Amino acid sequence: ALCVLKKGWLATAVYGGFFGAVATTDYLKYSMTGDYFYPWDLAEQAGHLGELKNFITVPFPVLYIAMILFVFVMAVIVFFSGAQLPIRWCFRYPALAVVVVCMAVSVSTPEKVTRLLNKNALYLEDMALQTSNYQANGFVGAFTINILSSNIQKPDNYSEDAVDALLDGYTEQDKSDDFSSPDIILVLSESFWDPTLLPGTTFSADPLENYREIASRENTISGRFFTTGLGGGTVRPEFEVLTGLSTDYLPSGCVPWQYILEDTDSYVSVYKGLGYKTMAVHPYTSSFYNRKAAYPKIGIDELHFDDDIYALGEELELTIRGRQISDDTFSSTIEYYLDKNSDSPVFLFGISMENHQPYPDKFETPDIEVKNDAFDESTANAVTNFTTGVSDADKCLKRLIDYIDNRDRDTILVWFGDHLPTLGGNMAAYRQSGMIGAEYDEESYEKIYSTPFIVYANFDLGDSDLLHKGTDNNITSYNLMNGVAELIGSPRTPYMEYLEDYARALPYYNIRLHKTITDDQRKWVDGHRLLTYDRVAGGKYSMK
């Protein structure tokens, strides 16, 4: 900083201010979501800072206010001392260029990165489990490691032959004779989760009344959906549900869509190949999570974001609830685009927005009273408002079910929650209610990394090896649409066949579940990692 700015006080202010801001951001993010601040957060959120400030739900720490004052005082002291670098720019800038080139060369290969980090007592950790990275290396060290390790780590055994060996024996499965080309509605419901699972908590009404009634019907499939998100990170399960790939071995906290730079096979592309109209509906900005750029590359042709929904205006009876486009408007939008495209089968992926955090004081008048004597005031506020939001989502689900039942065209709805909600800083509601303790075991991880899902159709679904009628299903994000494909008899690729066998060996798995697995099961996990690398960063041999 001093080499560029010359003046000591300015370098002090810029350098101290930057790292102070980064440290504060890390504190706020971890307090709200239990996840750390990553380098790619800077790139992804740079254009949304004005919106993001509305998501802050924890008090600004006094310690960080003191740190800001300290940086200011130091800058003033240096200013009056007159300290500066007494070298002209024509010497400073070339020297800086030499330093930059040397740094670039020293991290130009993965081997050099590892060697450089180890010399400074910093060690590469499992990129999917950043807790160990931050605990071992501290914030600055872990942040540096993440900057230098933003590329996906290549599996040691990756090659075209290795990919072929994994998929050897699997063949393309054509559609079944009874495949009716049904419309497919796939809904990611923001933070859809059952708050009645919080021990000792009472509710004046059941927030998931409709979900439970629909799940009890004879032709319905429901259960637990295992996700890689917690309190945020919608994009991870979203990516896995649409592609069948895993985010376990991508840099933790990254935006998976940033790696989809060319056409990539997905569950969506299977239906596009059958002549389906493919579209996405999301009542939020199109630039978030790089969706606008990535969706067409996995086969989604029509993109409808908040600007399209606002443009439809009165035609949808647009309403705002909880500071977002309401779930009622969201369901109206889905119905609108399905009715508009009734001349051909449709695959529609929708992401709701109404029940997005922050929850404190989200709704003017919460619909359901919530009580738990263990909750402090702020936690009770968050849980109460979340409960109103998830009740609205439950009504949205019922509306779509009624819509499907009144259609002549075969239609299937696949509905799931992306992650548990943030209910107070540091998992407050879950800890205060006793749902989780200070130490986690496998059961605890299953609780916090699973949400409800439901599959419903206006035609007989039957059963499959991955999904069956009833409420006791367990499915992973990357296998959900694989199971649906088998239910309706749509074509299945060799990769989808591989994932089904993976589920036979290990019914549900992601690295965040901390499951103890056998050596044989580990082979399937490693195979999934290799195939994911192949499609997002490798030669795409599995698509040939």
Predicted regions mapped to residue ranges:
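Transmembrane and membrane-interface helices of multi-pass
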Residues: 1-130
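Short secondary-structure junctions and interdomain/linker hinges
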Residues: 3, 28, 56-63, 75-79, ...
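Short amphipathic alpha-helical surface patches that serve as generic macromolecular interface elements
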Residues: 15-18, 110, 137-140, 394-401, ...
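Membrane-interface micro-motifs in multi-pass membrane enzymes
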Residues: 32, 40, 129-139, 228-232
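Alpha-helix initiation and N-capping motif
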Residues: 46, 136-142, 160, 208, ...
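N-terminal post-signal-peptidase region of extra-cytosolic proteins
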Residues: 56-59, 168-171, 260
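Membrane-interface segments at or immediately adjacent to transmembrane helices
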Residues: 107-186
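Solvent-exposed soluble domains appended to multi-pass membrane proteins
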Residues: 171-182, 186-189, 194-544
